[in-house]
C-alpha cells in the first residue's frame, strides 16, 4: 500500500512552499496538481513521475472531485507515493477535507502538509496586515462564490458587525452582491476594500477603494479571477 500527501503549494510564489511540501513533490511517483499551483514547482518532480492536471475554473472542472478522489485511492492501492498538490492550503477552500474523507473510507495512509493561504500571503505582498493591534483584532476567511441569497449560507450580519478584517476567496464575479450584503448588514459604504489579482506572483496587481466605489473601479481596471478580496481598515496600509 502506498501513501498520499495532501500538500499546500502556497499562494503562487514558488518560494513560499514549505520544505515538507517540496520533499513531497520530490519523492512522489504520482502528482495531481491544481490550476493555481505554480508550475515551476513541478520541475522538482522525479523524471519518471506521472503528473496529472486537475485544474478547475468557475463552471468548468477538468476532473470532477469524485474522479480525483478515485485517482488518489487507485494509485495508493498500487503502492505509489501520491502527492496531491493544491494552491494555498489544502484545508482552506481546497476540498482537502473531502479528499481526506475518501482516503479514510478506503483505509489509505495519508498526511496533510499545510501551505500558506492567499488570504494572508496576498494581503502581505500588497502591504496589508490582516491583523493590527490598533485596527484589527479579528479575521475571517469567507467563500465568496455563492451567487444569490437563496444559496448563500454566509452569516453576513455576523461578518459585517463582528469581524474586523475579511479575506474573501472566489468572489470577483460576485463583488456587487458581496458589497451589497456587507453594507446591508452594517458596514458603511466608506469601508476600505482591496482586490489583489494573482497575489504573490510576478504580475500581481492591487486595486483599492471602498464598498461603495470598488465595483466600478474593478470594472474599469478589468480585474478578474483569481483575486483575493480584503475588507477592513487594514486596507489603508496598502
From Swiss-Prot:
Pathway membership, UniProt: Cofactor biosynthesis; adenosylcobalamin biosynthesis; precorrin-2 from uroporphyrinogen III: step 1/1; Porphyrin-containing compound metabolism; siroheme biosynthesis; precorrin-2 from uroporphyrinogen III: step 1/1
GO biological process: cobalamin biosynthetic process; methylation; siroheme biosynthetic process
InterPro entries in the record: 4pyrrol_Mease (IPR000878), 4pyrrol_Methylase_sf (IPR035996), 4pyrrole_Mease_sub1 (IPR014777), 4pyrrole_Mease_sub2 (IPR014776), CobA/CysG_C (IPR006366), Siro_Cobalamin_biosynth (IPR050161), Uropor_MeTrfase_CS (IPR003043)
Regulation: SUMT exhibits a substrate inhibition phenomenon at uroporphyrinogen III concentrations above 0.5 uM; this property might play a regulatory role in cobalamin biosynthesis.
GO terms for MF: uroporphyrin-III C-methyltransferase activity
Amino acids binding S-adenosyl-L-homocysteine: 11, 87-89, 117-118, 170
Keyword Methyltransferase set for record: yes
KW Chaperone (keyword) present: no
EC number: 2.1.1.107
Keywords of the record: Cobalamin biosynthesis, Methyltransferase, Porphyrin biosynthesis, S-adenosyl-L-methionine, Transferase
Gene3D superfamilies tied to this protein: Cobalt-precorrin-4 Transmethylase, Domain 1, Methyltransferase, Cobalt-precorrin-4 Transmethylase, Domain 2
PROSITE patterns in the record: SUMT_1 (PS00839), SUMT_2 (PS00840)
Reaction equations catalysed: uroporphyrinogen III + 2 S-adenosyl-L-methionine = precorrin-2 + 2 S-adenosyl-L-homocysteine + H(+)
Domain of life (superkingdom): Bacteria
Family of the protein in this entry: Belongs to the precorrin methyltransferase family.
Protein task: It is a step in the biosynthesis of both cobalamin (vitamin B12) and siroheme.
Complex and partners: Monomer.
Protein name in UniProt: Uroporphyrinogen-III C-methyltransferase
Source species of the chain: Priestia megaterium (Bacillus megaterium)
UniProt gene name: cobA
Amino acid at each position: 500500500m502506498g501513501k498520499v500527501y495532501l500538500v499546500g503549494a502556497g499562494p503562487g510564489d514558488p518560494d513560499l512552499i514549505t520544505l515538507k511540501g517540496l520533499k513531497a513533490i520530490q519523492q512522489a511517483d504520482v502528482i495531481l496538481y491544481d490550476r493555481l499551483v505554480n508550475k515551476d514547482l513541478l520541475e522538482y518532480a522525479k523524471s519518471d513521475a506521472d503528473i496529472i492536471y486537475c485544474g478547475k475554473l468557475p463552471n468548468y472542472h477538468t476532473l470532477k472531485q469524485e474522479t480525483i478522489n478515485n485517482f488518489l485511492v487507485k494509485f495508493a492501492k498500487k503502492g505509489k507515493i501520491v502527492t496531491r498538490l493544491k494552491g494555498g492550503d489544502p484545508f482552506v477552500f481546497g476540498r482537502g477535507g473531502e479528499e481526506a474523507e475518501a482516503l479514510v473510507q478506503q483505509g489509505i495512509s495519508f498526511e496533510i502538509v499545510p501551505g500558506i493561504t492567499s488570504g494572508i500571503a496576498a494581503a502581505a505582498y500588497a502591504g496589508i496586515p490582516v491583523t493590527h493591534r490598533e485596527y484589527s483584532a479579528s479575521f475571517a476567511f469567507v467563500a465568496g462564490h455563492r451567487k444569490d441569497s437563496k444559496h448563500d449560507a454566509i452569516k453576513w450580519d455576523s461578518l459585517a458587525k463582528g469581524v474586523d478584517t475579511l479575506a474573501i476567496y472566489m468572489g470577483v464575479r460576485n463583488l456587487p452582491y458581496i458589497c451589497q450584503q456587507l453594507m446591508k448588514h452594517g458596514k458603511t459604504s466608506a469601508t476600505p476594500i482591496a482586490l489583489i489579482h494573482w497575489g504573490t506572483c510576478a504580475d500581481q496587481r492591487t486595486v483599492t477603494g471602498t464598498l461603495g466605489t470598488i465595483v466600478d473601479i474593478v470594472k474599469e481596471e478589468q480585474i478578474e479571477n483569481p483575486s483575493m478580496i480584503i475588507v477592513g481598515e487594514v486596507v489603508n496600509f496598502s
